[in-house]
């Protein structure tokens, strides 16, 4: 195995490789964040398995297994790029969840309260944004693809993670979008934009959603853009129990990712067990 010390100069070429692999901006930001932390902590040290195992132990002491694994995936990719395949480490074992904690799962009723709270605050844009994510299941990073042209066609062509898929807009949503576009005098391009005309970013949306919690009487732990995507998945699956079709709609390459989205709450799990009536 070649000998080389960990250096900050190793990061830019890896960043270029991620760009050439057509990774999304959000994915690149996440990967580079973890790699920079790894390099900053151990710069100047020889790259070997012991170094990476030490890093893994540090992650295990600081983060939950799922968060630690995200960091390990980024650093393993960085090591492979530089030819240190033998230094890569295995992820932490994570037990498959049987149900979703109720304090993290947004219900349909809570979603409705959030939309109403946005309308009460005279935030038509935020209310429509919530409805758009929840009615289509798109990622928050894919919102820029909800354009004036998409609202006219009734479908959006989304490019994400090296794949292209068509997202259909329900007729009721299409009507609302067109009315909003007309009212805001948006001529073309993304519908959800800031005052300067730029597409809203993840942090703007997150902050505005969190501001609705108290008025809507919804726990902040449930209010994230991704919670709306999960709610879409559960509602769709309750109508059509086709997880493969749902994976295609959500843009998942791995069907196991989709299965995580449709896990029910502990209360629902308990209700199903009660209906079995196996205690004599």
Where are these regions (language model features)?
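Conserved catalytic core of the tyrosine transesterase superfamily
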Residues: 1-280
């Amino acid at each position: 195995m070649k000998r080389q010390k960990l250096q900050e100069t190793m990061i830019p070429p890896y960043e270029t490789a991620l760009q050439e692999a057509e990774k999304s901006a959000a994915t690149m930001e996440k990967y580079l964040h973890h790699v920079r932390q790894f390099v900053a902590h151990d710069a100047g040290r020889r790259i070997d398995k012991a170094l990476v195992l030490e890093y893994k132990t540090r992650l295990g002491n600081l983060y939950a297994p799922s968060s630690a694994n995200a960091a390990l995936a980024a650093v393993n990719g960085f090591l492979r790029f530089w030819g240190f395949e033998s230094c890569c480490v295995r992820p932490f074992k994570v037990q498959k969840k049987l149900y979703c904690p109720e304090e993290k799962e947004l219900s349909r009723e809570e979603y409705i309260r959030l939309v109403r709270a946005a309308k009460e605050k005279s935030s038509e844009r935020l209310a429509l944004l919530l409805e758009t994510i929840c009615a289509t299941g798109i990622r928050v990073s894919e919102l820029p693809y909800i354009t004036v042209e998409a609202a006219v066609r009734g479908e959006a062509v989304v490019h994400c993670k090296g794949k292209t898929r068509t997202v259909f807009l329900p007729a009721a949503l299409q009507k609302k979008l067109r009315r909003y576009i007309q009212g805001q005098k948006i001529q073309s391009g993304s519908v959800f934009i800031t005052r300067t005309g730029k597409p809203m970013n993840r942090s703007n949306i997150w902050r505005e959603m969190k501001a609705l919690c108290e008025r809507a009487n919804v726990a902040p732990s449930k209010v994230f853009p991704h919670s709306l995507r999960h709610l879409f998945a559960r509602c769709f699956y309750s109508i059509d129990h086709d997880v493969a079709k749902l994976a295609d709609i959500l843009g998942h390459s791995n069907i196991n990712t989709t299965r995580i989205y449709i896990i029910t709450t502990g209360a629902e799990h308990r209700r199903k067990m009660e209906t079995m009536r196996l205690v004599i």
